[in-house]
Curated annotation (Swiss-Prot):
Record keyword S-adenosyl-L-methionine present: yes
Catalytic activity field: guanosine(527) in 16S rRNA + S-adenosyl-L-methionine = N(7)-methylguanosine(527) in 16S rRNA + S-adenosyl-L-homocysteine
Function statement: Specifically methylates the N7 position of guanine in position 527 of 16S rRNA.
The protein's name in its UniProt record: Ribosomal RNA small subunit methyltransferase G
Superkingdom as given in the UniProt entry: Bacteria
Main location: cytoplasm
EC number per UniProt: 2.1.1.170
Keyword Ribosomal protein among record annotations: no
Stored InterPro entries: rRNA_ssu_MeTfrase_G, SAM-dependent_MTases_sf
Residues in the signal sequence: none
Amino acid sequence: MMEVPREIIEKLEIFQKLVKKWNKSINLVSDNTIHNFWQRHILDSLQLMQYIDNKEIHLVDIGSGAGFPGIVLSIAGVAKVSLIEADLRKCIFLEKASKISNNNIQIINQRIEKVEIDCSILTCRAFSKLNTIFNCIKNISVQEKFLLLKGKNYLTEIVEAKEMWLFDYLIHQSITCEEGKILEVSNLTKII
């Protein structure tokens, strides 16, 4: 189990309450995950911290939605987080949620394909297949790696992506779900 300081747990509990409150008016998370919120959403996001060696980085979270994993990682100590979300209603929520963190959070209300930004690490959760992710981020420069929370079809996604892209990857077991995996991707290059 992960050791999480009390101050961070308190902030994550405030974030949890905010998500539940806003979820009544805009669909941030599935209603059937509310009963298991801490494990399904908070811990699922928080587990990425074990693959972030240096917290003094710029992390970009695409398709941020309810702020998983971006807001959680900021609360846990990542110095600068940019959240990219096309839905204005979700961006308004993310703006409110960003106040919980002591760190720098930037909300970008645009389609991912239009965003030009540099970062050390790129994350996403419940967004899309690998090929779609890689195609969407053509204007985003990822210096270090991708940390992608994936489900049971992760191997098929890797095989399909390898037809169009060269990349190195590690597969880590999720601590929250037997079928869940964390793909750590680096050295991404499109095959011409």
